[in-house]
Amino acid sequence: MRLTDCYNILRLFSEKPCVKLGELGSDVAEELINLELVYRGISGELCIRSVVQLAMVSIKQGCDPTKVSTYLNWRDFEAFVAEALLESGYEVFKNFRFGVKKWEFDVLAVNTTSSLGIAIDCKHWSPKYSSSGKMRDVALVHLEKLKKFLDWCNYELLDHPLLRKIKKFYGLIVTISESVRGSIQGVAVVPIYYFRDFIENLGYYVEELKVVTLKNPCYIQE
């Protein structure tokens, strides 16, 4: 996929989910089909499976992450994260608000089988998040927000009784850029391209990256 192609393709699919073959060209269409990024609709049009997946492939092939991110909206990003978590057995709450000040996580995920929870914020729309200094500030705020959530957990049990089954929580920030990754202020910073791998191997990465583990004071062992 040529660099000029990737931006045009992202533009088309960010505007509508399905496009006519003539809008892409046969060579580009064939490549997208081979990469399993699109499928054929009822009338022969090509429909995108995931704009985020297309964005990740574009970045891997050399497209600028900052420019690529302009074709994504926060719903695309969070939907991809939520889908990956659901596939891994997590209960998912998007735009999870809590506390009198209405703090919010983009996604809160809990797995009652492993008794683990993950509080997630998605940072994809600004080049400033490629700065390690800025990301350090963001991670610190995220960690403090997670601590406040756990302090507030008793008030959340009425609406979310599953919290009783979660023993510990981790903080996670998902980015589109790969320039900053690892553990910052005890919070995992994971490029979206590696998100599925991180979730599937959570125990390994938590230990390897020294991600802070916060105990849930509302946990009740059954």
Where are these regions (language model features)?
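Intrinsically disordered, low-complexity Ser/Thr/Pro/Gly-rich regulatory segments
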Residues: 1-105, 109-222
